[in-house]
Amino acid sequence: MRYPIVIHKDPESCYGVTVPDLPGCFSAGNTVEEALMQAAEAVECYLEGLLLDSEPIPNPKDITFHTNNPDYAGGLWETVSIDLAALAREVTSKKLVSLSKVSIL
C-alpha cells in the first residue's frame, strides 16, 4: 500500500510530516530525506497498532484527493510504501509469542 504524505516546514522548525489518511499519524525529520524515513516508520507503527487491536486498515486515497485541502497548502507531497502482508505476518507472530508467554497456548 502507498500512503500519501505531506511534508511541511516552518522557518523555525524541522520538516513535519502529516499522513492525511491516518488521523493522528505524523512524524518529523531534520532533512526531507530523514522526514521520509521517519514517515515510513510512523505509518508502519500506526498500521501495526491497528492490526494488533484488530481494527480495520484505512485504504489510502490518491494524492489528488488531498492536494486541494487548504490545510496542506504549500506542502511537498510524497508517498510511503508499506508491505501490509509482511506487517500482518509480523503482527501475527508477535501475538503468538505474547500468548505463549502467558501460557495460553
Task: Kindly give the residue locations of the regions a language model identified.
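N-terminal segment of the canonical double-stranded RNA-binding domain
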Residues: M1-C14, T18
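Short, charged, surface-exposed hinge/linker loops at domain edges
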Residues: M1-R2, E41-L105
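A generic "binding-loop/recognition-motif" signal
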Residues: S13, L22, S103
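Short aromatic/hydrophobic contact patches that present stacked aromatics
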Residues: G16, F26, L96
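Short glycine-enriched loop/turn motifs at secondary-structure junctions
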Residues: V19-D21, E90-V91
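Short, charged/polar surface micro-motifs in flexible loops or helix N-caps
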Residues: L22-P23, L84
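A short, exposed loop/beta-hairpin motif centered on an aromatic-Gly-Thr core
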Residues: P23-E34
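Conserved anionic group-binding/transfer micro-motifs
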Residues: A35, A39
